[in-house]
C-alpha cells in the first residue's frame, strides 16, 4: 500500500520524503491557502512540491463547470509529469474525467462518499477515487465500510482505478485500509508521525541503551 502525505506544507513534505516512506502528495485549495502567505502564489507552491516529490501530486481544480475544469486540468497537467488532477464527484466532474482520461491525463476523483460514486468515477476513467472516511465517521457512519465495498466491487469487475483513502484521522484508519487492500492512503503529517510510535518501542530502546552503558560508559559503539 502506498502512503501519500495530505499537505501543502513544504517542510512537512521534505521531512516525509527524507524518511523514505512518502510515495506522493495530495493537496486541496484549503491546504494550499494555508501556505499562500508572504507573497507565495498558488502555482509556485505546486511547482515546488512537484520538484520535491517523485511520485504523484494531486492538485485540485476550482471550477465547478465542465469547460472550466478541463481548462484548469490541462494547465495543472502542464506543471509536471507527476501532476494528478483532482476533480470533484459531480455530473460535470464525471464528464471532465472522461475527457481528461481520453487525453491520458491522470485524475483523482475527490469527495467520494459511497461505493456507487466510486464505481461511476472508475467507469469515467479516473486514475484514483478518494473516499472520505473521516467525514463519514463524523456523521455516525462507518467510513471504512465503504472502502471494503469499493474494494469488493473493483475486484469483481477487475477495475484498475486505484482506491485512495482520504480524510484519515488516525492510525486505525491506515491499518484497516491496509487490511482491506486499499491501494493508497493519504494522511496528514501528524498521523504519519503517529504511525511510527509505540510506547513499547520507546521502552525497549531506553532499556537497550541503559544496558549498553554497562559495556560502554560513554554509550559509543566501538568495533
Curated annotation (Swiss-Prot):
Pathway: Carbohydrate degradation; pentose phosphate pathway; D-glyceraldehyde 3-phosphate and beta-D-fructose 6-phosphate from D-ribose 5-phosphate and D-xylulose 5-phosphate (non-oxidative stage): step 2/3. One of its GO terms (biological process) is carbohydrate metabolic process. Keywords: Cytoplasm, Pentose shunt, Schiff base, Transferase. It is found in: Cytoplasm. This is Probable transaldolase. The active site is at residue 86. Its main location: cytoplasm.
Amino acid at each position: 500500500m502506498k502512503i501519500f502525505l495530505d499537505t501543502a506544507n513544504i517542510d512537512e513534505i521534505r521531512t516525509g520524503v527524507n524518511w523514505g516512506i512518502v510515495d506522493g502528495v495530495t493537496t486541496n485549495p484549503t491546504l494550499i491557502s494555508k501556505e499562500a502567505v508572504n507573497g507565495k502564489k498558488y502555482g509556485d507552491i505546486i511547482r515546488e512540491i512537484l520538484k520535491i516529490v517523485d511520485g504523484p501530486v494531486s492538485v485540485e481544480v476550482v471550477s465547478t463547470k465542465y469547460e472550466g475544469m478541463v481548462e484548469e486540468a490541462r494547465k495543472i497537467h502542464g506543471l509536471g509529469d507527476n501532476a494528478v488532477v483532482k476533480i470533484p464527484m459531480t455530473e460535470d466532474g464525471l464528464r471532465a474525467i472522461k475527457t481528461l482520461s481520453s487525453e491520458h491525463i491522470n485524475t483523482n476523483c475527490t469527495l467520494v462518499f459511497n461505493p456507487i460514486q466510486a464505481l461511476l468515477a472508475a467507469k469515467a476513467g479516473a486514475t484514483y477515487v478518494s473516499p472520505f472516511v473521516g467525514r463519514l465517521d463524523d456523521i455516525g457512519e462507518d467510513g471504512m465500510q465503504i472502502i471494503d465495498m469499493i474494494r469488493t466491487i473493483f475486484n469483481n469487475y477487475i477495475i484498475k482505478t486505484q482506491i485512495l483513502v482520504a480524510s484519515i484521522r488516525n492510525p486505525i484508519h491506515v491499518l484497516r485500509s491496509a487490511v482491506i487492500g486499499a491501494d493508497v492512503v493519504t494522511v496528514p503529517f501528524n498521523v504519519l508521525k503517529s504511525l511510527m510510535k509505540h510506547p513499547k518501542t520507546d521502552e525497549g530502546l531506553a532499556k537497550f541503551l541503559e544496558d549498553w552503558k554497562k559495556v560502554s560508559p560513554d554509550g559509543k559503539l566501538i568495533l
